[in-house]
Amino acid sequence: MRYNIVSKGDHKSNSIKENMEAQMQDTKMIKDTETPEIVISVGGDGTLLEAFHKYSYRLSETAFVGVHTGHLGFYADWLPHESDKLIREIIDGDYEVIKYPLIDITVNYNDEKNPSHHIALNEATMKTEDNTTLVADVSLRGQHFERFRGDGLCISTPSGSTAYNKALGGALIHPSLRAIQLTEIASINNRVFRTVGSPLVLPAHHYCLITPVDQRTIMTSIDHVTTKHHNVKSIEYKVSEEEIRFARFRPFPFWKRVHDSFISDGRDD
């Protein structure tokens, strides 16, 4: 089996990576940085996001698994002291593939420039270049829904619903549901201007089109990458036809992860 290990880059993560690679020697495992069948992320969720984007061109052929060396590893289900056991499991090759939904993003421009296409594992946000009020028309399935005024909009996946979306008051959605969630960022609501004021959960056959009314230079953040787009006509968000594949060697229940990340203080019975 072809593999690659992506490290956070700190001493602890690099040490674990080197130890894992040493154990892979003289086995059927072949290190391949271009076309790996399994990618091991050693670090935090940010490291796994980087690994995901690095290999986003071959999602149907690559599975991901994470060892977390930081404080919070929502995607990484293995602890540093379990890395030897993980290597043995990988060498045995007996694992289940779990698939999570992704966001497909298309940025359309007013000039002759071709649309740019992106994919997100956690979320995508849309704001103005200078952090002024974003004024944008929101359409759902081709029908106008509202005119939004506020700091911006966040579109998240079910697995990403536990990240920035949660801080914005959005719902937590189980990754088995193929959906995206649209959540407002500090919307303006008064007697003159009105938005729905609640997160919207859109199924896979719906799409969301956001059209800036005044601002044409838009800042988008797609997972960990922020990009400036000039002369933006609209941005379309929908559930991607592609999915991320996780290699599961043992149960890793979503709601237990939520509990352990946000509720547990380590003293639960």
From Swiss-Prot:
Subcellular location: Cytoplasm
Keyword NAD attributed: yes
SUPFAM superfamilies linked to this entry: NAD kinase/diacylglycerol kinase-like
InterPro entries: ATP-NAD_kinase_N, ATP-NAD_kinase_PpnK-typ_C, NAD/diacylglycerol_kinase_sf, NADK
UniProt entry keywords in alphabetical sequence: ATP-binding, Cytoplasm, Kinase, NAD, NADP, Nucleotide-binding, Transferase
Catalytic activity from the UniProt record: NAD(+) + ATP = ADP + NADP(+) + H(+)
Cofactor(s) essential for the protein: a divalent metal cation
One Gene Ontology biological process: NAD metabolic process
Binding residues annotated for NAD(+), in chain numbering: 45-46, 122-123, 149, 151, 186
A Gene Ontology molecular function term of the record: metal ion binding
Record has Protease as a keyword: no
GO CC field: cytoplasm
Catalytic residues identified in the record: 45
EC number(s) reported in the record: 2.7.1.23
Catalytic EC class: transferase
Homology family: Belongs to the NAD kinase family.
NCBIfam families per the UniProt record, alphabetical: PRK04885.1
Function recorded in the entry: Involved in the regulation of the intracellular balance of NAD and NADP, and is a key enzyme in the biosynthesis of NADP. Catalyzes specifically the phosphorylation on 2'-hydroxyl of the adenosine moiety of NAD to yield NADP.
Protein name: NAD kinase
Natural source organism: Staphylococcus carnosus (strain TM300)
